[in-house]
Amino acid sequence: MEVLAKHRFARTSPQKARLVADQIRGLPVAKALEILTFSPKKAAVLVKKVVDSAIANAEHNEGADIDDLKIAKVFVDEGPTMKRIMPRAKGRADRIIKRTSHITVVVSDR
């Protein structure tokens, strides 16, 4: 049984979120939560929320035992980018790109 959870339009760049996602792929959920809890990265907080949601979905919807769950898949896709303007000297302007991510976590009991 596979259960998934998503966080769409997360306000972090996919490159930074993938660094965190790669650390927990394939681990038991207890070990993954331990790593995410003590990680100093902002993306770790976002990924931890998705992992917690996936665990809750497995518990509530499928009646799964938490001790048997592991992270089957975790991937971070690129969301839409927000374009902003930063005023500069002499009437010029620079474009600022604020990236978003779609974080998906799949837990399974196998």
From Swiss-Prot:
InterPro entries attached to this UniProt entry: Ribosomal_uL22, Ribosomal_uL22_bac/chlpt-type, Ribosomal_uL22_bac/org-type, Ribosomal_uL22_CS, Ribosomal_uL22_sf
A UniProt-annotated Pfam family: Ribosomal_L22
One BP term from GO: translation
Molecular function as annotated in GO: rRNA binding; structural constituent of ribosome
Keywords assigned: Ribonucleoprotein, Ribosomal protein, RNA-binding, rRNA-binding
Record-level GO cellular component terms: cytosolic large ribosomal subunit
Reported function: This protein binds specifically to 23S rRNA; its binding is stimulated by other ribosomal proteins, e.g. L4, L17, and L20. It is important during the early stages of 50S assembly. It makes multiple contacts with different domains of the 23S rRNA in the assembled 50S subunit and ribosome.
Family: Belongs to the universal ribosomal protein uL22 family.
UniProt-listed PANTHER family: CHLOROPLAST 50S RIBOSOMAL PROTEIN L22-RELATED, LARGE RIBOSOMAL SUBUNIT PROTEIN UL22M
Assembly with partners or alone: Part of the 50S ribosomal subunit.
Protein name: Large ribosomal subunit protein uL22
